[in-house]
Amino acid sequence: MKYVFIEKHQAEFSIKAMCRVLRVARSGWYTWCQRRTRISTRQQFRQHCDSVVLAAFTRSKQRYGAPRLTDELRAQGYPFNVKTVAASLRRQGLRAKASRKFSPVSYRAHGLPVSENLLEQDFYASGPNQKWAGDITYLRTDEGWLYLAVVIDLWSRAVIGWSMSPRMTAQLACDALQMALWRRKRPRNVIVHTDRGGQYCSADYQAQLKRHNLRGSMSAKGCCYDNACVESFFHSLKVECIHGEHFISREIMRATVFNYIECDYNRWRRHSWCGGLSPEQFENKNLA
């Protein structure tokens, strides 16, 4: 093309001379140059979108995929839809942290009495302190395992109680429940659902339930779906801040888990159950 030739040789010959020899109008040449350098409206939008999505993705510590990023950006006033955000992530080669397979904690037969399943996989609660759920998971460090027990309010999915220990004991479960009771100002008649682990069937834990007029409930044997909400939290914890990291000590793991629960998950991590709000935002909105 003549304009391409002129562009390639403009350092050697004058524009005027080349236009005359090639019989093209100089105005046509300059119009072509302007069109080449002008960014289309669509390109401008994509560049703006990519910049905004990258910033939000970075703030989420690479934890959010397209749906949660869309909620986050809409809350900031950007009218993007999920397809637009997903396309931006693909263009930039960005992917949220992915899960990996792990084996759940196995429990030995203990012969202790178990409670009836009062929940029956009905995780809906119309208000706070109606249904709580608890469980224990383990976290690997160079010093050995660190066990984490949590209590979640199924109304908002907030982690209201937690405890960590190098040993998986009944006291670990009791401490997590005690924190939940303290935070929620000791409500009564709450259904507290757990699995059938020895820590939850222990005399100490059962006495704590009875002392505070709480209603114990336990999953069916070997059915992880009966406590799916807590399993989902553990999955998020491990995918978003544990997997891919190396923890040389239990103390570093403690600090990481504390920060995730209290600073990230409860306060600002957007939850689909809460309509795209964080558990804390959901509670503040509905208790105002």
UniProtKB/Swiss-Prot annotation:
Residues 124-287 form the Integrase catalytic domain. The keyword Signal does not apply. It comes from the Bacteria. GO terms for molecular function: DNA binding. Keywords: DNA recombination, DNA-binding, Transposable element, Transposition. PANTHER family: TRANSPOSASE INSF FOR INSERTION SEQUENCE IS3B, TRANSPOSASE INSF FOR INSERTION SEQUENCE IS3B-RELATED. Belongs to the transposase IS3/IS150/IS904 family. Involved in the transposition of the insertion sequence IS3. This is Transposase InsF for insertion sequence IS3A. The lineage of its organism: Bacteria, Pseudomonadati, Pseudomonadota, Gammaproteobacteria, Enterobacterales. The gene is insF1.
